[in-house]
Design a protein with these regions (language model features):
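Catalytic-core regions of core metabolic enzymes
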Residues: 1-335
Length: 335
């Protein structure tokens, strides 16, 4: 089918719902995810969640595991399979039937016996997997784990948009557990040489309106932040770049800016997330340019998100989950 990606990839997804399997493929595929296998196992009369988790743990083509589960057949066997899988690879799980209403729906959907939420959460946490609360959040976290790049800490450099957007972005990032660190002195000195008229106004997040709408300066500052060891992560609100399209040669400038974003993660070796949702401009020319850019970023393997809040929360959880996995691996190695 044309709506499915044709290339294989490194994400394995097991789902107790065929419709959820379809949505993860289409939503994830549009954001650059590619799959080793997607398995919809329904009422688990033959193969169940423990069998499939064990398979994905041992599958050389699968590097990240995602799961939608409504109920488990054998709690002890499921926990052992989940612990095995999470020790080897990142595992993201969405539980169906977390509430009384959900448990009733799960019973009629797949005859699953949905477990009590507190017991489930404790088991998932102890096994080392990452629990999410919606299908969109599952896709967000798999995008982070698969495409964002290495997360070595929580210090983030941000291209935050303009004015109030920058202020709101700083708040959202802080609330997500990220450290919006001030510009270090060596970076400020570099800005003094590059932007002598505005350097002292520039901070983190970078306020694009200070540097002028539709200009490259904000992106150049972001490149400097990505190259600076003071920052572990970079979060880019690419919506501010859409203003380049207002200029006479806007499509060319905008295309060049998007090309820089495509390569920023590879060049910096850091975790990069780009915010590029639906364009705020509604005329056909600018709408098409922005949507083409979004598709191009996804095709280039860039972790893209629809809004700053979603990206910041995903980045915060990604950093914490990666750190916990590293702690577990170190503890296991020293045992």
């Amino acid at each position: 089918d044309e709506i499915f990606p044709h290339e294989s990839g490194n994400v394995g997804f097991l789902s107790q719902s065929g419709s959820h399997a379809f949505r993860v493929i289409t939503r994830g595929g549009a954001r650059g995810l590619r799959f080793s296998k997607v398995i919809s196992y329904g009422n688990a009369m033959d193969l169940n969640e423990a069998d499939l988790l064990t398979h994905f743990a041992e599958d050389p083509d699968t590097e990240v595991i995602a799961a939608y589960i409504e109920g488990v057949r054998d709690g002890r066997r499921f926990f052992e399979a989940l612990r095995l899988a999470a020790a080897r690879k990142p595992v993201v799980i969405l539980k169906g039937g977390r509430t009384a209403a959900g448990r009733t729906a799960a019973a009629s959907h797949t005859a699953a016996l949905a477990s009590e939420q507190a017991v489930w959460q404790a088991a998932v946490r102890q096994a080392g997997a990452l629990e999410v609360s919606s299908l969109n959040e599952l896709v967000d976290m798999v995008v982070a784990l698969t495409l964002a790049g290495p997360a070595k800490g929580s210090s983030v450099g941000v291209l935050g948009g303009a004015g109030g957007d920058s202020v709101e972005t700083a708040d959202i990032c802080h609330e997500a557990g990220l450290d919006v660190a001030p510009l270090p002195q060596d970076l400020r000195e570099a800005l003094r040489e590059k932007l002598p008229h505005t350097w002292d106004w520039i901070g983190n997040p970078v306020d694009g309106s200070i540097l002028g709408w539709g200009r490259f300066e904000a992106l150049e500052v972001t490149q400097l932040m990505a190259a600076n060891p003071a920052y572990d992560l970079v979060l880019i609100n690419a919506r501010s770049l859409e203003h380049m399209l207002n200029q006479e040669d806007g499509e060319k400038l905008f295309g060049e800016a998007i090309d820089i974003l495509k390569n920023l993660g590879k060049e910096s070796g850091k975790a990069i997330m780009v915010v590029m949702g639906e364009p705020e401009f509604r005329d056909e020319r600018r709408w098409k340019a922005a949507m083409d850019a979004r598709e191009g970023l996804a095709a280039a393997g860039v972790a893209i998100y629809s809004d700053i809040g979603t990206a910041a929360r995903a980045m915060g959880r990604y950093v914490r989950y990666t750190a916990k996995r590293q702690e577990r691996a170190a503890s296991a190695a020293s045992a």
